[in-house]
Amino acid sequence: MAQINCTQVTEFILVGLTDREELKMPLFVVFLSIYLFTTLGNLGLILVIRTDARLHTPMYFFLSNLAFVDFCYSSVITPKMLGNFLYKQNMISFNACAAQLGCFLAFMTAECLLLASMAYDRYVAICNPLLYMVLMSPGICFQLVAAPYSYSFLVALFHAILTFRLCYCHSNAINHFYCDDMPLLRLTCSDTHSKQLWIFVCAGIMFISSLLIVFISYTFIISAILRMRSAEGRRKAFSTCGSHMLAVTIFYGTLIFMYLQPSSNHSLDTDKMASVFYTVIIPMLNPLIYSLRNKEVKDALKKLIASKNQMLSS
């Protein structure tokens, strides 16, 4: 077998969302506004949950971790994308690209698995309310959060190592606004069959298992709600689960659209638009979904603002 002449790539060029100069500044302003709102919303939600004793429950423990993941998730991608709107040569070093891919995969996987943990929490709350504090003890809650973090970071590390051990000799221009797997694989001259098989198996197991947990949990939840005799009880139960159902639908729906569409319809331009949605828009939407639809969070936020105003006026 002939030896591939592999020149070590030291940096990549991120093509970005657009090459039209007149669009770059408006897009910079839009995405900067979204990122600031995302940061304020997610860190604000964590602060509200941490400072209000009424929110020290399993449901809000999971929600604060989801907000943390959303903040990290967005921060891995958006600042570099904002910088690329301002510079003509959108360079990223080899090591920085590897770190970005690894962190992105870790937080995306963690979010996917955390949504499954939250679905299980809602299942226990609706279907086994008398045993809720036993089945969702602090130790179990910690395990339901620690397991997604541990699994996601180990998988992301192995995934990034496999990707960046490949030989890149075709080009160093990544047709994306961040370092993602599929655009990177198009630049390599190494055999990628084993790598693609790893992606398919690992992502498939993670995605199907987490989606199955969510589906089974909500099948039992909806069945239990429909059996409730009290209309007020049904309304309260649907209200409790509605925010999570909406967040799950948006997140998994975007991933299904991106990764399960026919290969004939698959293009990097379509990937870019879908990637904007789940790397930039979803982390901004989640605090809105969980706070605007949640009376306890809104009351805690009002209480926090009132106490801060009282401190400033005294």
Curated annotation (Swiss-Prot):
It is found in: Cell membrane. One of its GO terms (molecular function) is olfactory receptor activity. PROSITE patterns: G_PROTEIN_RECEP_F1_1, G_PROTEIN_RECEP_F1_2. Residues 1-25, 76-99, 155-196, 259-271 are extracellular. It comes from the Eukaryota. Disulfide bonds join 97-189. SUPFAM superfamilies: Family A G protein-coupled receptor-like. CDD domains: 7tmA_OR8K-like. One of its GO terms (biological process) is sensory perception of smell. Keywords: Cell membrane, Disulfide bond, G-protein coupled receptor, Glycoprotein, Membrane, Olfaction, Receptor, Sensory transduction, Transducer, Transmembrane, Transmembrane helix. It is a multi-pass membrane protein. Pfam families: 7tm_4 (PF13853). One of its GO terms (cellular component) is membrane. Residues 47-54, 121-133, 218-237, 293-314 are cytoplasmic. The chain crosses the membrane at residues 26-46, 55-75, 100-120, 134-154, 197-217, 238-258, 272-292. InterPro entries: GPCR_Rhodpsn (IPR000276), GPCR_Rhodpsn_7TM (IPR017452), Olfact_rcpt (IPR000725). Belongs to the G-protein coupled receptor 1 family. PANTHER family: OLFACTORY RECEPTOR. Potential odorant receptor. This is Olfactory receptor 8U9. It comes from Mus musculus.
